[in-house]
């Protein structure tokens, strides 16, 4: 029998697939490599299973040819880049996506089912590998089960209820009608994915060696369950107004069963979500917490905490009780820029190295320094960031005032960041996450990796007549006067001698997400619950101290005062606070697209007019709130069908029992 190396086999199995037969598997092997050879031994089986991950796109692909619409399909991003170049989030909001032409979004359907088919082949044939020990078999099957569950999870995020194949191995010689089947209900889908992840977690390791960073762990399985349970408890899937409006008349045509229960609210779902989050929070490694928020200790460049904060009695205590003793800008920023060691970041419940994120830094980088300069943030995002003492821009203090007139008089330096003199006062005195994420006119760009004169330590502006302004390009400019800089390291450069970029990691699940989902879930409880997950039972209730403890870890890490009992006075008040916090904390991580949908506020947020600075003006009239002068603003489509993506029409027509998503063509 032919010897197949891990590298060759993995590369073959990770190749892109173009077949329309979404339940075929043999199409993906050349005549040189037979499926029987895969199960000849342990080594080949391992390579085969890891080859499945090649079907799943780099999760850090947020903007271009992405599996999900991402930031460009929300109120956190806008661009003038041509949609023909794969900016399909813009295609979606401009009404250019259809079931007959879903562009890259069809990848979720085709590649996920390719992955599921492969996993089922492993379940059916793994015993053919005679050199597997019982432990080998258990570990490989757990990994296989996780990958299959993750593929179903991606399908659920994109389309809602899925077609469940179970463990059935699908031969490639079946006629189309032999594998036609209806979609499961939403409840059946969620329960199946979660049960599969629970089973997978039993034999997944808690950690891997550093060289194997990115492989799914027990915590990754538990973290996915926590996210799925939180989404499932949210209004879109749990009797909210959006559920009734979007899914009230959505019945399975094969038996007239409703896909989504829209007329009943189940509070216990929030309790299960809270317990699932708590399980991740309780995980230990050598007696210490398995996961924690990433922090950097303060040093001589760390600015002092803001004075006069009285709303949070713990604020001046050392972190994690309060906000003292850490550098808030670096603690947030360095896990995205590549400064932090990706493989040892304790905040990654599950993460992977992402070359796409490295490449995407070019989208926010100034065009005059080798970038494309057009991945814009909106004024809404800029306004959402608090002042340095945690107050909103509408309620700023005398010590840290907010102003939309005038410019700063002196340069400030803090945490390795330089805030130039002459910066618009709107951008002064803001919280540290603002400086980590927002590129604005008169921002200082270090670009320290290059040694070429004039290519580093530069100030960039977006005035109409500046080198990075609108007059220089029809598409490669910021239509709002802001760009995303969250993933850009001070050393990163795209032009000049020795220009290079730091490696980046993409957090598929961050511990900050677990903490905020936990706080959110507890907030919606009106009584105490005892929830059993595996062998453990978790007691959950709307305990104000528990909510504050989890939520304030995130707040204090960013240098902001924690919430008070007044903020928790009622469920709705805290929900609004949490929505803003998630918008800031997870900016351009792909979370907001799903958040506004699960909360049922997608239409509300999308109906708000995109605004920014006046990029048609020179410096004298640039600094005024303006609707970008582009037809794309008026062309934005807001429709309830956009809560879910369309299943590709060619797949729907091959499967007569499979219903299309509401309001999409079938």
Where in the sequence are the language-model features?
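Acidic, serine/threonine/proline-rich low-complexity intrinsically disordered regions
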Residues: 172, 179-183, 187, 236-274, ...
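Bacterial Sec-dependent N-terminal signal peptides
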Residues: 1-30
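Short coil/turn linking the two alpha-helices of tandem helical-hairpin repeats
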Residues: 156-157, 161-163, 228-240, 524-528
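Membrane-proximal, proline-rich intrinsically disordered regions
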Residues: 20-70, 297-298, 425-428, 650-666
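Conserved, well-structured interaction surfaces
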Residues: 37, 42-60, 82-159, 176-218, ...
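Long, intrinsically disordered, low-complexity segments
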Residues: 19-22, 112-115, 192-194, 256, ...
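Long, low-complexity, polar/charged, intrinsically disordered or flexibly structured peripheral segments
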Residues: 364-490
């Amino acid at each position: 029998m032919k010897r197949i190396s891990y590298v060759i086999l993995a590369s073959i199995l990770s190749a892109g697939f173009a077949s329309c037969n979404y339940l075929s598997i043999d199409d993906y092997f050349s005549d040189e490599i037979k499926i029987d050879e895969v199960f000849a031994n342990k080594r080949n089986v391992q390579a085969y299973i890891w080859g499945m991950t090649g079907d799943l796109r780099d999760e850090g692909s947020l903007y271009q040819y992405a599996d999900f619409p991402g930031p460009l399909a929300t109120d956190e991003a806008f661009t003038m880049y041509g949609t023909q170049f794969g900016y399909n989030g813009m295609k979606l909001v401009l009404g250019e996506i259809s079931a007959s032409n879903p562009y890259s979004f069809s990848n979720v359907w085709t590649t996920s089912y390719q992955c599921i088919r492969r996993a089922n082949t492993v379940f059916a044939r793994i015993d053919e590998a005679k050199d597997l020990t019982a432990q080998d078999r258990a570990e490989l099957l757990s990994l296989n089960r996780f990958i299959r569950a993750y593929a179903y999870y991606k399908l659920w995020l994109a389309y809602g209820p899925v077609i469940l194949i179970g463990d059935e191995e699908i031969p490639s010689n079946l006629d189309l009608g032999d594998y036609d089947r209806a979609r499961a209900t939403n409840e059946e889908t969620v329960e199946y994915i979660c049960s599969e992840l629970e089973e997978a977690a039993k034999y997944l390791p808690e950690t891997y060696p550093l060289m194997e960073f990115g492989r799914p762990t027990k915590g990754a399985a538990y973290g996915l369950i926590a996210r799925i349970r939180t989404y499932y408890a949210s209004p879109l899937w749990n009797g909210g107004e959006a559920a009734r409006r979007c899914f009230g008349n959505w019945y399975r045509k094969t038996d007239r069963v409703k896909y989504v229960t829209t007329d009943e609210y189940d509070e216990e779902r929030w309790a299960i979500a809270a317990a699932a989050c708590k399980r991740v929070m309780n995980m230990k490694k050598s007696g210490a917490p398995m996961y924690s928020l990433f922090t950097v200790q303060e040093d001589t460049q760390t600015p002092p905490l803001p004075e006069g904060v009285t709303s949070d009695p713990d604020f001046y205590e050392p972190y994690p009780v309060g906000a003292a003793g850490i550098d808030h800008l670096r603690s947030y920023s360095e896990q995205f820029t590549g400064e932090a060691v990706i493989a040892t970041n304790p905040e990654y419940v599950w993460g992977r190295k992402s070359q796409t994120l490295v490449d995407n830094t070019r989208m926010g980088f100034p065009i005059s320094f080798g970038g494309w300069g057009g991945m814009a943030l909106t004024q809404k995002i800029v306004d959402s960031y608090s002042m340095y003492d945690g107050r909103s821009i509408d309620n700023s203090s005398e010590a840290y005032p907010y102003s939309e007139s005038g410019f700063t008089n002196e340069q400030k330096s803090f945490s390795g960041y330089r805030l130039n003199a002459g910066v618009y006062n709107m951008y002064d005195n803001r919280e540290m996450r603002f400086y980590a994420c927002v590129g604005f006119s008169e921002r200082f760009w270090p670009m320290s990796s290059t040694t070429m004169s004039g290519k580093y330590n530069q100030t960039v502006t977006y005035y109409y007549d500046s080198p990075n302004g609108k007059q220089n390009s029809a598409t490669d400019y910021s239509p709002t006067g802001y760009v995303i800089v969250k993933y850009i390291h001070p050393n990163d450069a795209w032009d000049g001698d020795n220009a290079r970029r730091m490696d980046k990691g993409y957090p598929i699940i961050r511990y900050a997400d677990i903490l905020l989902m936990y706080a959110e879930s507890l907030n919606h409880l009106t009584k105490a619950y005892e929830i059993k997950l595996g062998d453990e039972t978790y007691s959950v209730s709307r305990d104000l101290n528990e909510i504050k403890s989890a939520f304030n870890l995130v707040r204090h890490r960013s240098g902001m005062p924690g919430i008070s009992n007044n903020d928790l006075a009622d469920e709705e008040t805290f929900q609004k606070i949490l929505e803003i916090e998630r918008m800031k904390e997870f900016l351009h991580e792909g979370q907001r697209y799903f958040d506004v949908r699960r909360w049922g506020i997608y239409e509300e947020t999308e109906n708000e007019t995109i605004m920014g600075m006046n990029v048609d003006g020179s410096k004298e009239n640039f600094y005024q709130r303006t609707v970008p002068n582009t037809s794309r603003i008026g062309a934005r489509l807001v429709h309830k069908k956009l809560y879910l993506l369309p299943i590709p029409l060619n797949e729907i027509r091959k499967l007569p029992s499979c219903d299309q998503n509401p309001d999409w063509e079938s």
